[in-house]
């Protein structure tokens, strides 16, 4: 069945007549150019005014990561525009990032993301990692798993993205920090590249893992550090 499980279900647990009523099924875009049957195995990240300071909207902004390597944002708020007077609607969703996943490179996102808001910057960061959880011991030099962090530059607003642009550039908007032990290559702080080049790569970071390593559980953000469980 094409697109098995590639949907976000909005369920009403407070409906007294029909408890657990499905209010909406939001189909997630299935990239036909990829050789992966898409699915959403992880728990969504849900941002509400109850859990986050400074939020003015009612409802929630929701984020999911999927098998195809996409990071998707959903508008479940009462906002009616994107801050630039462009109209938005309830249940709108847009792809923020594509990490170029394939069967060959094994970049499956089995596990949920963790998220946090910078104390000073107020930026929302989402953290995820990849690895075929059903074949943890499988080794192949073609495997190219990663762990990464991505910054939603529009938060706390919802802005529709050009998905053709997102799919085309993939991780090019993020900084490769694989061999960086000092932080010099991190987004917004790197001084190895020009200001123009830095601006093009300031939406996130990623670390390439050796072919023998896979992320085996969801990451954990604590006190400004992100911890990734790695199977080797």
Give the predicted meaning of each segment:
Residues 1-232:
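Beta-propeller fold recognition
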């Amino acid at each position: 069945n094409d697109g098995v499980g590639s949907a976000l279900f909005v369920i009403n647990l407070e409906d007294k007549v029909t408890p657990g009523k499905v209010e909406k099924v939001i189909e997630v875009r299935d990239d036909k150019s990829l050789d992966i049957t898409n699915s959403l195995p992880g728990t969504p990240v849900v941002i509400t005014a109850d859990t986050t300071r400074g939020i003015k909207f009612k409802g929630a902004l929701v984020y999911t990561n999927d098998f195809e390597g996409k990071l998707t944002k959903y508008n479940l708020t009462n906002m009616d525009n994107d801050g630039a007077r462009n109209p938005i609607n309830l249940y709108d969703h847009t792809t923020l990032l594509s990490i170029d996943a394939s069967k060959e490179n094994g970049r499956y996102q089995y596990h949920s993301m963790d998220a946090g808001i910078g104390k000073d910057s107020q930026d929302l960061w989402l953290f995820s990692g990849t690895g075929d959880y059903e074949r943890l011991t499988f080794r192949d030099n073609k495997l190219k798993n990663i762990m990464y962090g991505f910054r939603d530059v529009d938060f706390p607003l919802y802005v529709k993205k050009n998905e053709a642009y997102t799919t085309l550039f993939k991780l090019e908007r993020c900084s490769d920090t694989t061999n960086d032990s000092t932080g010099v290559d991190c987004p917004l702080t790197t001084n190895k590249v020009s200001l123009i080049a830095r601006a093009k790569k300031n939406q996130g970071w990623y670390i390439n893992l050796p072919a023998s390593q896979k992320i085996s559980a969801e990451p954990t953000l604590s006190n400004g550090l992100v911890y990734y469980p790695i199977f080797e």
